[in-house]
């Protein structure tokens, strides 16, 4: 049962519109890593307050936290300098799963709340990709399965029960709503699905936060 959900614009965007820009900021500013770490931890703590309020609870009721992220975000939130990920060979400082007290990295929850970070895989294939693989389990199927996780960074997984391949590619700031006139992050009101009627070729779309589909004519005009 999902008791509450919340999201927030990535506050690190003021230090760079994409991942590599943020790493460049850290390289050029001695205090950069600390600023990015403080920004994301503050945002996460704000989300905890929102979630607790929506669930009619208190942040002290949060006992376990699971965290997944792309490698740069993973390193930043843990207080690890991400500069090694800014140039080849894009080496991770750590790829291990992490189990620690949330308070150790400044997260506001129950004083003894545990923080579980899934392991990063390699290079720019992070704990978010590991979470997708665990959830979808493409390595358990006889048939070949393609999983595409598109965000600020895109991971592509191709696997069956004999072999698993994964790669990563930057997608730029578009998926955070930057440098495009009508973009926004994946929150309520954003278009999440589009279907084309096979007979009429008319499109319809579904937005996050709504169970209804719309065939508003304006959408057709926008697409054309």
Q: Could you describe each region identified by the protein language model?
A:
Residues 2-78, 84-87, 116:
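N-terminal glycine/serine-rich phosphate-binding loop of ATP-dependent small-molecule kinases
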Residues 61-63, 125, 150-152:
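Short, basic and Ser/Thr-rich N-terminal targeting/leader segments
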Residues 21-32, 91-119, 182-193:
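Surface-exposed acidic, glycine/proline-enriched linker/cap segments
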Residues 111-145:
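Conserved phosphate-binding catalytic cores of ATP/NTP-utilizing and phosphoryl-transfer enzymes
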Residues 4-18, 84-97, 131, 137-222:
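Glycine-rich phosphate-binding loop of actin/hexokinase-like ATP-binding domains
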Residues 68, 126, 147-149:
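Alpha-helical architecture
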Residues 28, 32-43, 121-125, 215-223:
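Catalytic cores of large soluble enzymes that bind and process phosphate-bearing ligands
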Residues 45, 49, 130-134, 224:
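Predominant activation on well-ordered alpha-helical scaffold segments within soluble catalytic domains
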């Amino acid at each position: 049962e999902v008791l509450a959900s919340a999201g927030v614009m990535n506050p690190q965007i003021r230090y760079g519109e994409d991942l590599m820009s943020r790493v460049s900021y850290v390289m050029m500013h001695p205090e950069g890593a600390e600023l990015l770490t403080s920004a994301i931890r503050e945002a996460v703590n704000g989300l905890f307050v929102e979630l607790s309020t929506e669930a009619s609870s208190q942040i002290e009721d949060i006992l376990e936290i699971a965290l997944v992220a792309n490698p740069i975000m993973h390193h930043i939130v843990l207080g690890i300098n991400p500069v090694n990920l800014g140039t080849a060979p894009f080496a991770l400082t750590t790829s291990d799963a992490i189990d620690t007290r949330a308070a150790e990295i400044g997260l506001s929850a129950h004083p003894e709340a545990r923080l579980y970070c899934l392991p990063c895989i390699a290079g720019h294939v992070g704990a978010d990709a590991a979470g997708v693989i665990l959830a979808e389990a493409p390595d358990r199927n006889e048939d070949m399965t393609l999983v595409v996780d598109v965000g600020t960074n895109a991971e592509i997984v191709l696997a069956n029960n004999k072999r698993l391949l994964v790669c990563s590619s930057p997608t730029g700031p578009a998926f955070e709503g930057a440098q495009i006139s009508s973009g926004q992050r994946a929150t309520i009101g954003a278009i999440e699905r589009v279907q084309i009627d096979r007979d009429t070729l008319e499109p319809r779309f579904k937005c996050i936060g709504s169970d209804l589909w719309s065939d508003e004519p304006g959408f057709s005009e926008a697409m054309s």
